[in-house]
């Protein structure tokens, strides 16, 4: 039944809790919301993000204010930037009277690419994630994660074969804790430039010839991929801490090859 606006409704979650157990993380997850972002060229791009938002809860408080997480998203105006995401974290902690929290949003991100020979354009989708972590009495950290599909070609197969070499699609996951803003495009390009070849949404026959020969001239083991990308990440001043992983979906096996490498920049 509908309740009159002036009726008293007890706020049960705001009551005291006698168990004296702090909760490190409580909130909402699987919350899908439309999102606008600025791409590397400053143009607006639209997507749908899946949010996970949480705060720490003191031991004496029974529950957090779940509705305020959604209110936080409703209060947004304009495209979300990396700096704006840090502001959202500060607003969330203020709204929920918390000293620690986490915002994670995962979304498909589309980049328009041009085929290497014909020049035809097409969109390619990437999985992207932005994470803001705030611990009590510490500065908030911003992490960017992307999954870039690429082509890898086996150096051993090329060396021992009279013609051809086995190749496959690989997924390279790059995760970077940022010192300053860095575009998704910039992180993706590092992966694509260090792969045997990048992949495209649309290729004509001259383009297919080009990418086939590009991969053949640039063979790399899964170990080569993560090492070459790591060298690029180590020399990126916008990155404080990084991790790179590659999964090669082997075309001659029913399993994947995998490698992971991580480190910190001085």
Swiss-Prot record:
EC number: 3.5.4.16
Name of a matching Pfam family: GCHY-1
Enzyme class at the top of the EC tree: hydrolase
Marked site (May be catalytically important) residue numbers: 154
A Gene Ontology molecular function term of the record: GTP cyclohydrolase I activity
Entry keyword set: Hydrolase
GO biological process: tetrahydrofolate biosynthetic process
Pathway of action: Cofactor biosynthesis; 7,8-dihydroneopterin triphosphate biosynthesis; 7,8-dihydroneopterin triphosphate from GTP: step 1/1
Reactions this protein catalyses: GTP + H2O = 7,8-dihydroneopterin 3'-triphosphate + formate + H(+)
PANTHER family, alphabetized: GTP CYCLOHYDROLASE MPTA
Family to which the UniProt record says this protein belongs: Belongs to the GTP cyclohydrolase IV family.
Protein role: Converts GTP to 7,8-dihydroneopterin triphosphate.
Protein name stated in the entry: GTP cyclohydrolase FolE2 1
Species for this entry: Dechloromonas aromatica (strain RCB)
Lineage of source species: Bacteria, Pseudomonadati, Pseudomonadota, Betaproteobacteria, Rhodocyclales
Name of encoding gene: folE2-1
